[in-house]
Structures are given as structure tokens and as C-alpha cells.
Amino acid sequence: EVIASQPVDPDLVISTLTQPQFHGAAHMYQKHMTQHMIDVIPRDWMKTVTNVFLLRHPARVISSFSKKYENPTLHDIGFQKQIELFRFLLDAGHNPVIVNSHDIIRFPEKTLKKLCSHLSLDFDPVMLCWDIGGSRYDGVWAKYWYGAVHRSSGFSEPEGTLPDLPKKLQSLEKRALSHY
């Protein structure tokens, strides 16, 4: 369903991702997940955009991911690929921004102001809230992943302590921590 909903030709996708204006907008936000950044697709296009890495503690990623995938692997949760992509950009002379999801949730205004400043964008307080429900830009995967966001109208309360993972996932957390 997801693959059928959009182009699969890498050149066409890259062309869309790097066009100067998207639907007339001067700036375009793109969310990429590491499992979509497969090795056979060229990465040079990443050098033409500003990259921000949003990190989340491995225990939180694993806890969330394991609700959708029965036995997630280190490859599935993407920490190794994040390091690889980050190093690719460093080697190309870029200095990608790293934002920890904990900071956005705990200090949304402060964190977004810093991010906007780094990206040479104006901060607008409207960034701190949104209408409940989905967006036409969500994509077909929204019904699988965006339930909590669709029920919200702003940033949630700060996250509590790290989740206790089942024993079978604790070694995965330990391996992921070395890449975090």
C-alpha cells in the first residue's frame, strides 16, 4: 500500500525532494526514516539540502517500534544507519544539526527557537500547536504511525523515565546505545 502510493524511481524521488520550491513554498520539511535510505539509492542529493537528525533514546525507540514489529533488529531501528548518514555529511563538509526528541518535548519553544535560528528561519509560536487530526501531507502510513499525533494539538507532557524493556529486547538496547 505504501509503495503503491508514490513514485519508486529513485531519480524521480530525488528530483522531487530537491526541487527549489515545493508547491510554491520557500522551505520544505522532509521526514526520512533510516530504513528508507537504502544503500542502492544515491545520497549525493543530501548534500544539497540542510539536514537535521532527530534522535530518540534507544529504549524509547525500541519500546515504540516493538509495538508494530514483533522482533525489531538493530537494522530496523536505524541507529547504525544514522551514524553512517551523519558521517557521510560530515565527510562532505556539512555540519548537520542534531536534536534530541527529549529536548523538543521538554522545552519545545526553546528548542524550536534554537533550531530555527540554526536554519535561518523565523520562529513562529504557531509552531507549538496544531489542529487535532491528520493532514493531507501525512501519507498512507499515517494510520499506522501517527495516531498519537492526530489525537494531539501540541507537544505532550515531558516523557517520564525510560521504559523497562522486556529481557529479549535489552541486548538490542545495549547495542543501539553504542550508536546513540
Language-model region placement:
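Generic hydrophobic, helix-prone segments enriched in Leu/Val/Ile
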Residues: E1, F53, A176-Y180
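PAPS-dependent sulfation machinery
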Residues: E1-P42
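A structural signal for well-ordered alpha-helical scaffolds and beta->alpha junctions
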Residues: Q6-D11, H75, F79-Q82, P108-L112, ...
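Residues that form generic nucleotide/phosphate-binding pockets
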Residues: T16-P20, S64, L85-F88, K168, ...
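PAPS-dependent sulfotransferase catalytic domain
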Residues: Q30-V126, V140-A148
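PAPS-dependent sulfotransferases, especially Golgi type II membrane carbohydrate sulfotransferases
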Residues: D122-Y180
